[in-house]
């Protein structure tokens, strides 16, 4: 079994797309991801921008708020899944806010802590 330090090393340098419409939560995500050794690829505050960033690529995984600017993030999740890019959902509503076909994907509750975010990201990379 790998140590926590070894697992965390697997996040070092990973480029993350953050899809979050609330500025303070996006800033918290950026801070926590940085502490985990990740690099922020971009922050998208709406679905069209997120889809354009997914199309352009250049990142290793994504953190997706389930509700972005009054829209569901599922088109972005579908685009990521089609490209085999790992992702984590973030929601204050728990699993009940997810579509059935995405309930097997890692979910981190909001507000999230560094520990919970780290575990969810590692789970996404392992899928």
Locate each region found by the language model.
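Active-site residues of response regulator receiver
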Residues: 65
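Non-catalytic signal-transmission and effector/linker regions of two-component phosphorelay proteins
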Residues: 1-15, 99, 113-127
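Conserved acidic carboxylate
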Residues: 20
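A Lys-centered signature of the CheY-like receiver
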Residues: 110
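Acidic, metal-coordinating helix/loop segments flanking the phosphotransfer/catalytic sites
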Residues: 43-61
């Amino acid at each position: 079994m790998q140590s926590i330090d070894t697992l965390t090393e697997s996040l070092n340098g990973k480029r993350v797309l953050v899809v979050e419409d609330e500025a303070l939560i996006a800033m918290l995500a950026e801070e926590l991801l940085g502490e985990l050794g990740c690099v922020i690829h971009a922050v998208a505050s709406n679905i069209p921008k997120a889809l354009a960033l997914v199309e352009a690529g250049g990142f290793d995984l994504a953190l997706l708020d389930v509700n972005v600017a009054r829209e569901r993030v599922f088109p972005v999740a579908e685009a990521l899944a089609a490209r085999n890019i790992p992702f984590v959902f973030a929601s204050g509503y728990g699993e009940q806010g997810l579509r059935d076909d995405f309930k097997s994907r890692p979910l981190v509750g909001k507000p999230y802590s560094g520990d919970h975010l780290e575990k969810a990201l590692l789970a996404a990379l392992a899928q």
